[in-house]
Amino acid sequence: MSTAALVEGKIVQCIGAVIDVEFPRESMPKIYDALILDGSELTLEVQQQLGDGVVRTICLGASDGLRRGLTVKNTAKPISVPVGKPTLGRIMDVLGRPIDEAGPIESEHTRSIHQKAPAFDELSPSTELLETGIKVIDLICPFAKGGKVGLFGGAGVGKTVNMMELINNIAKEHGGYSVFAGVGERTREGNDFYHEMKDSNVLDKVALVYGQMNEPPGNRLRVALTGLTMAEHFRDEGLDVLFFVDNIYRFTLAGTEVSALLGRMPSAVGYQPTLAEEMGKLQERITSTKKGSITSVQAVYVPADDLTDPSPATTFGHLDATVVLSRDIASLGIYPAVDPLDSTSRQIDPNVIGEEHYSITRRVQQTLQRYKELRDIIAILGMDELSPEDKLSVARARKIQRFLSQPFHVAEVFTGSPGKYVPLKETIRGFKMIVDGECDHLPEQAFYMVGTIDEAFEKAKKIS
């Protein structure tokens, strides 16, 4: 459509990021149509039709300098972003515009960020395991290829570091394409991630879409959809794509801000009344079809460490595996601080992961659960009051707890110890030896921050 044919309207009200625009009554824009401010790059997205030709829009960019009477043009279509191979190796904003100063993105294809979820008969569930090289995840909450994974945790327990390690272990080994959506996170982390990818020579396989903390709520609300649209295009071309989102909570938070600005009545804890619908629309699109797969890893901030908060609670139901990071475990110095009793996966089924893996996972969890039950008795009466069986359970549980820790590649610069990738077979063998009692003679310090069980034996020799 040529610019001359675009219907024009005038701004009639500005309240923060919400702009009301009046159009001729017979040519009101549709919901989700993109409007462009005349003589500027600023885009507005229609959210509500108020009647009498007035539409309420959300501003995708700073609303500084806007005033009543300015001319706005209706593009008569939703926000569309470039998709396909030209997006790889580039950093883009919510509108798909490059922000890495490396020239324009020459893409033949564009795609609307608002798409319908694939039809039920197009879906293709998978039970194939995706090895991560992180012991606690591979053992307790294994990932499925084409599945959805959530990393849940409060502030500062290691969500982003865990996600970076997963990207390091999976994206580098994967060989396919990845899309990273930075939703309302720190700009520094986005910058670090870009350089991390560049240094490891996988930048040409990753598309980066950022709507960071300092950006208006409209950008943070839509940037997850922009990244997802790019991932969907690769999937529909028959590829297996990895989709990383950091952080889904900020998507919800941006929705809360926008909802309040639009004048909707808040629901529980101040969240938007449409929380479940917005989350569902996003999550139902992150799925694998008969053409290709999207394997997604999403970091989910947990406000005040409360997993029953409406935002994380709404996210739980959409996931195949949940990795719960615990402040109590982090305070013991055990990293990754994954809670082996809270974390779950739908893959934990003997028909999927095999009888051996299943039984060892359950035995490890039973041992840790027993230790948890005995902790109060130990605190009051001491270890001496326990029965010999319970003493043995506690000793093994403490070894398991330490063996679940692991040095990360992405944390080498902070810790000084080289990162370890542990194959699934080695993980199962190591934990089998501990629960079978083959390591009862080793000191528990030998299991802390090692890779395989053989390294624990080596470390024990040095300690003794």
Curated annotation (Swiss-Prot):
Compartment list: Cell inner membrane
UniProt main location, coarse: membrane
Domain of life, source organism: Bacteria
Enzyme Commission designation: 7.1.2.2
A single GO cellular-component term on record: plasma membrane
Pfam families according to UniProt: ATP-synt_ab, ATP-synt_ab_N, ATP-synt_VA_C
Record: residues binding ATP: G153, G154, A155, G156, V157, G158, K159, T160
Keywords linked to the UniProt accession: ATP synthesis, ATP-binding, Cell inner membrane, Cell membrane, CF(1), Hydrogen ion transport, Ion transport, Membrane, Nucleotide-binding, Translocase, Transport
SMART domains in the cross-refs: AAA
Disulphide connectivity of cysteines: none
Membrane topology, record value: Peripheral membrane protein
GO molecular function, one term: ATP hydrolysis activity
InterPro entries: AAA+_ATPase, ATP-synt_VA_C, ATP_synth_F1_bsu, ATPase_a/bsu_AS, ATPase_alpha/beta_chains, ATPase_F1/V1/A1_a/bsu_N, ATPase_F1/V1/A1_a/bsu_N_sf, ATPase_F1/V1/A1_a/bsu_nucl-bd
Catalytic reaction equation(s): ATP + H2O + 4 H(+)(in) = ADP + phosphate + 5 H(+)(out)
Gene3D superfamilies per the UniProt record, alphabetical: 2.40.10.170, Bovine Mitochondrial F1-atpase, Atp Synthase Beta Chain, Chain D, domain 3, P-loop containing nucleotide triphosphate hydrolases
Protein family (similarity comment): Belongs to the ATPase alpha/beta chains family.
Function: Produces ATP from ADP in the presence of a proton gradient across the membrane. The catalytic sites are hosted primarily by the beta subunits.
Subunit structure: F-type ATPases have 2 components, CF(1) - the catalytic core - and CF(0) - the membrane proton channel. CF(1) has five subunits: alpha(3), beta(3), gamma(1), delta(1), epsilon(1). CF(0) has three main subunits: a(1), b(2) and c(9-12). The alpha and beta chains form an alternating ring which encloses part of the gamma chain. CF(1) is attached to CF(0) by a central stalk formed by the gamma and epsilon chains, while a peripheral stalk is formed by the delta and b chains.
Protein name as catalogued: ATP synthase subunit beta
Gene source species: Burkholderia ambifaria (strain MC40-6)
